[in-house]
Regions:
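C-terminal non-catalytic interaction/assembly regions of soluble proteins
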Residues: 1-51
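Core alpha/beta catalytic barrel or barrel-like domain that forms the active/cofactor pocket
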Residues: 39-41, 75-80, 136
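Flexible inter-domain linker/hinge segments
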Residues: 49-102, 281-290
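A short, terminal or domain-edge coil/loop segment
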Residues: 39-49, 59-69, 185-193
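A structural signal for alpha-helix termini and helix-coil/disorder junctions
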Residues: 34, 64-68, 271, 275
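Active-site cofactor/cluster-binding pocket
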Residues: 4-7, 11-22, 26, 99-109, ...
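A short acidic, often aromatic-flanked loop/helix-cap motif at beta-alpha or helix-coil junctions
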Residues: 46-53, 228-234
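Short, surface-exposed amphipathic charged segments that create phosphate/polyanion-binding patches used
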Residues: 2-3, 53-63, 237-242
Length: 290
């Protein structure tokens, strides 16, 4: 460690109740024990409650280190209103390269959303000169739970090893989520929002939460609705809405020409479902064309 280092923050992705500190923090403290001019060492926790950190949280760690008396035993990523150990992320930082498209997809476990998004990454990575990145978060249920896909596409290398906190495009594949989750959190001004819903335009106006309508209006969000469930049932796909929503994504997001996207999606269908027979392939192709 250079002599110029005066303070060190150690982050552990664990919580050790009853211990004087977390494992990595104790290792670092032990390494400097008894050394002359040892730096000040503070420890913190991250990733608690499945709340992964983003650049704003890391900036808060540096701000804490810069204080005259840095807080020890802090947490980042959550709001700790019980023991008040959390650091407040004051800076809203977007560290992705300029021109990068960030897209979030809220899906239902087993509806095919994650698989379709993995195909989208492969399509863009294989057929364009763009870089692609994908992260996928799940809840604890094997099927029927919530899935959130985080995709980034751009002309420059993407070095953002964290979930999306600033999105250009958000898709919600289950209309009930608009009541349960803040699906539009982090959507940029002039962004796009695609909602899969059985509601008519009049019902959308009536049933969409007021806070969501306010956000859409104030941030000039392009709002699209699609009844993918009805289309899937008419085609014979049941609840598998993934290819319908994926085709809509390529149409709205305008990452690659939609004609090329449809061609590549149909190639991906053959790769993914070819072994299940021509009927299944044709149904998925019909879903893309719909």
């Amino acid at each position: 460690i250079p002599d110029t280092v005066k303070k060190i923050a150690v982050l552990d992705k664990t919580k050790e109740p009853g211990s004087i500190g977390e494992p990595l923090y104790l290792d670092v403290v032990r390494a400097f024990y008894g050394k002359e001019n040892a730096p000040m060492i503070v420890g913190g926790r991250f990733g608690l409650g499945s709340k992964d950190p983003n650049p704003s949280h890391i900036a808060a760690v540096y701000a804490n280190l810069n204080a005259d008396e840095p807080k020890n035993g802090f947490t980042i990523g959550i709001v700790d209103d019980v023991t008040n150990t959390s650091l407040v992320a004051t800076d809203d930082i977007d560290a992705t390269p300029e021109g990068t498209k960030a897209c979030k997809f809220w899906g239902l476990g087993s509806d095919g959303t994650v698989g379709a998004n993995k195909s989208a990454i492969k399509i863009i990575g294989d057929h364009t000169d763009m870089y692609a990145q994908g992260y996928f978060s799940y809840d604890s249920k094997k099927s029927g739970g919530i899935t959130v896909s985080h995709l980034r596409f751009g002309k420059k290398p993407i070095k953002s090893p964290y979930l999306i906190n600033k999105a250009d495009f958000v898709a919600c594949h289950n209309q009930s989520y608009v009541y349960k989750y803040d699906v539009l959190e982090g959507l940029k001004k002039n962004g796009s929002f695609l909602l899969n819903t059985i509601w008519t335009p009049e019902e959308v106006e009536e049933k969409l939460p007021a806070s969501m309508k306010k956000f859409i209006a104030e941030n000039n969000i392009s709002f699209y609705t699609l009844n993918a469930v009805k289309i899937a049932q008419e085609i014979g796909l049941g609840g598998r809405i993934n290819m319908i929503m994926q085709a809509a994504f390529f149409k709205i997001a305008d990452i690659i020409p939609v004609e090329d996207a449809i061609k590549y999606l149909k190639q991906a269908v053959v790769t993914s479902y070819g072994k299940k027979g021509e009927k299944v392939v044709n149904m998925n192709n019909a879903a893309i064309d719909a």
